[in-house]
Design a protein with these regions (language model features):
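Juxtamembrane/transmembrane-helix boundary motifs in multi-pass membrane proteins
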Residues: 23-28, 85, 127-132
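Membrane-embedded alpha-helical segments and adjacent helix-loop junctions characteristic
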Residues: 1-62
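Hydrophobic core segments of alpha-helical transmembrane domains in multi-pass membrane transport
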Residues: 2-5, 36-44, 114-120, 136-153
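Juxtamembrane and boundary regions of transmembrane helices in multi-pass small-molecule transporters
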Residues: 49, 53, 121-167
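Short polybasic/polar patches that bind polyanions
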Residues: 9, 66, 122
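Alpha-helical membrane segments and immediately flanking helix-loop junctions
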Residues: 35-118
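A broad structural signal for alpha-helix termini and local helix breaks/kinks
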Residues: 25, 68, 72, 124-125
């Protein structure tokens, strides 16, 4: 996958994704993270592997988030966005990837994590079904999405305040 990512980046994938997000008035860094976290939960449920940060977040989600940051701060380019904001965007990207991937995987019968827990509990003599494990994971995944959304909406609020003081 890395050669394909390199080719896509060479031909402007990052720039085009940032341009698209800049044009969407409703797109903010926080909202983008919420949507991405929900997307990762869904892919985890379906058992789809995106291989995480290097092939997906860095070349696609991060430039889109920076584009949303540019729109929030009224910056013509990423160089105009404060460096601390860029670092916070990287952290938010990592958080949304990790929250969605980790908890989303526990909602699928075909993911190794849930099968490992099932195997260990069965080996220890507990009577448990894979379905029960998935059912217990649903509230935890829901809580992670809600708390992640709160975290990302607070990030948006903070960015709006910073943008208002810098203009």
């Amino acid at each position: 996958t890395l050669p394909a990512i390199g080719l896509a980046e060479r031909h402007g994938l990052q720039e085009q994704s940032a341009v698209v997000i800049r044009k969407l008035a409703a797109a903010t860094v926080g909202r983008l993270q919420i949507v991405y976290q929900l997307f990762r939960v869904l892919t985890g449920i379906l058992g789809v592997r995106l291989n995480g940060h290097p092939p997906f977040v860095r070349p696609l989600i991060f430039p889109m988030s920076v584009g949303a940051g540019e729109a929030t701060f009224g910056a013509p380019s990423a160089e105009e966005v404060p460096e601390e904001v860029i670092e916070e965007i990287k952290a938010a990207n990592a958080a949304s990837e990790n929250y969605g991937n980790f908890y989303g995987q526990n909602l699928s019968l075909v993911q190794p994590g849930i099968l490992l827990v099932f195997g260990v509990m069965t080996g220890l003599g507990y009577t448990v079904s894979v379905w029960n494990l998935v059912m217990f994971a649903i509230p935890i995944a829901t809580i992670s999405v809600v708390l992640g959304a709160i975290q990302f909406l607070l990030l948006d609020r903070r960015y709006r305040g910073k943008a208002a003081t810098t203009r």
